[in-house]
Amino acid sequence: MGKARTTHTFCRICEASCGLVATVEDQRVTALEPDKQHHGTLGFSCMKGLHQHSMYDSPDRLQTPMKRVGDRFEPISWSQALSEIGARVKSLRAVSPQSLGMYVGTAAGFSILHPIFAEGFMQGLGSRNIYSSSTQDCANRFAAAREMYGFPFFQPFVDLDHVECMLIVGTNPVVSKWTFLQVAHPVKRLKQVKHRGGRIIVVDPRYTETAKVAGEHCYIKPNTDVFFFLSFLEEIFSRDAADAPHLQGKASGMDALREVTRHWPADRTAEVTGIPADTLRDLVNTFLAADGAAVVTGTGLGMGKDGTLAQWLAECINAVSGNLDKRGGTLVGEGIFDFAGFARKNGMFMRKARSRIGDFRELNGGFPGGILADEILTPGQDQIKGMFVTGGNPLLTMANADRMREAFKQLELLVVTDIYLNETASLAHYVLPATSPLERPDLPFVFPLFLGMQSIPYLAATEALVKPSGEQRDEASIY
């Protein structure tokens, strides 16, 4: 038995990136505890984060590259796997670079190098066909930001330390932590807002766990957020409460927005949303009276009907009320460098390519995951015939799994990189074993590092805590 040692690291399961103290013995992580001295995450961690090492030690963990032979998988060397995959890729690329596609899952986003090298690999192939899990839950935010601010990663976030009124719409941070903002210990942070006299009002079809903490809940019918926001804006304009000086020289289209909202007074939308007109007016009163207020949204809004329009209207409320880029309102973070300027200079995330199926415009360098099955199954020029799946399990997480399964079975090449032989990998021609987060050095992912989307600013880094248990490789090195 080797001597146990403790070391500091951080979790890479969700955006909170909680600080952890790991106990390591004989090249195994034997325990994970919250880092009570951590500047940013305040000694908090959820149960998933504290028990993740048990999953990485599972006997079902992939140890070597695997190749499908008939109806079973056989272990092969990395040299053989890369050689055979490379030969098939060259054959498909010779017909059309667009015959190759990639699905990038959420797990890729929590490794700083994984998505960079995965996208670089596809650029090297000359293929535009990248699909991601973001189109299922948060693409609306990127689309709204692209149209409103000119860059999809321009994502203002609530100033939790000073906000006096917070409308939480379509998100439940007590359970899901936060979204598009690095916040640990959500219950503690919400209670801090209340203890200093702030009000938190949850607008949701359900009396959520967050509503219980907030103490104030406003019922809304599902998929009617757009009408709620339109009436909210109409109230602001009808009271002549729009903060024009705050937006002077910074915004255009105010008159057009005023005209659109004029047709949706609270009395008209009350029956649609289920929110009485007087209740909505009271919400507007509270919001405008606060010295710092914010509408906060999440995946409930993004996965609902008209999610992009709803997100845009929510951003408009924050801007028109004078709370955009304001203490106590919504802030614009600063990362370690000017990511937006760098991206604009290099044309990142702003290409105007269109999909073969549906003619959808590219967003954040990718197309909607919902058209992936059709891109594979529909014959014609640039039909996808080879796929790489990395950091995700689309057969389990995407809608219409039966059609996705049919599509994957038709592929001439399916390569899956993961830590387990999951549902998607079970259909693959090759499965490549990846390292776990505890087996790689890392920095925080793009939101806190490049965009400064943190409620408490700090910079973290971690070394690999243990060596891989088998022949696993970090995804970035694979691509």
Residue ranges and their predicted role:
Residues M1-R239, P276, T390:
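N-terminal export/assembly segments and adjacent metallocofactor-ligating motifs
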